[in-house]
Amino acid sequence: MQCGVGQFTRLLYEAIEKLDPGRSTTLTLTQSQGSVADIRRAVGSAQSTVCSFPIVAWKRVIWRPLLALAIARLRRQRVVLVQHEWESLHWLRRLTYLPALLLANTIVMFSPQVRRELARDPVAGWIAAKCVLAPLPPNIEAPSQTADSPLRQRLKAARENGRLVIGHFGSIYPGKQPNTLLNVTAVLRARGRNPLTVYIGSFIKAFDNVEADFQARVSELNLLEDVIVSGYVDSSAEVFGLFGEVDAFCYPLEEGLTARRASILTAAQTGRPVIVTGPAEADEFDHHLRFKELIEHGAIVLVPRGSDDSAYADAIVASLKQSTAYPPFDFENWWKDAAEAIEAQL
């Protein structure tokens, strides 16, 4: 499956096209795509330019979007930068993004917390005055049909044998505190709940030792038979096939839940309870009513920040006893909301 920001950009283009067909086009910038001539031609035919950060191969590709934004400003176009993260990025990565922040007329963010992170940056804090908030939709829509896989059959068999299957969807990196969920798994096992925790995703290689540290913690807790890491999953049909065999999802997050967590929204589409650390600030979802409704209806269960591993275990067990009759997930209108918010800045 495509990286999260790339998938977001493609879906944003499609959503804006639905609002005003023929108004927009896309330019993909990779190591092999997007020559200087391509960039000049594409930007030259536009009235405004929208760019999404962060990018995966930033060391090798960063000059291309920066060139596009610079050309756009020289042509007196409006430049909108969609910035998904800030403090969670490596400081060198943030440094390379500073020219984009300076060139942008408007910076779209999806979380008040991320905006506060930029505001307290000692170098770029003053740029936060350019920021506006938009509601983030999920990158992946639940398909009409799911796909089978050997891992799905393994999870199905585990549930049939009475195991409690706990899910964690998305890339695995330190910001998601993957090792904390291992501690929760150990608590549930000590209580006799016979858990099987499945991480549906793969490790991000940019983070040194994250996989080795994870595996060391698995061994330390003696969870070799209780933890599965799926690795890369090719399609949404296969992803949701795995989701169908999960009893509950769990995300212990040090920063707390933010409105930029698309992986949480993807998991919430399943109708399975999603247990996650509560937000750091009460205003986190004031701009995102659909996200707030998921919390109010119990699709997303908040655990107070600072809670111990036992509190997450308690929340998982309690969620299994609650009704899962949540309102239908209107994927198209989630994207319509985002497209309208960003189009208003063009």
Which residues make up each language-model segment?
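Acidic donor-binding loop of glycosyltransferase active sites
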Residues: G241-T258
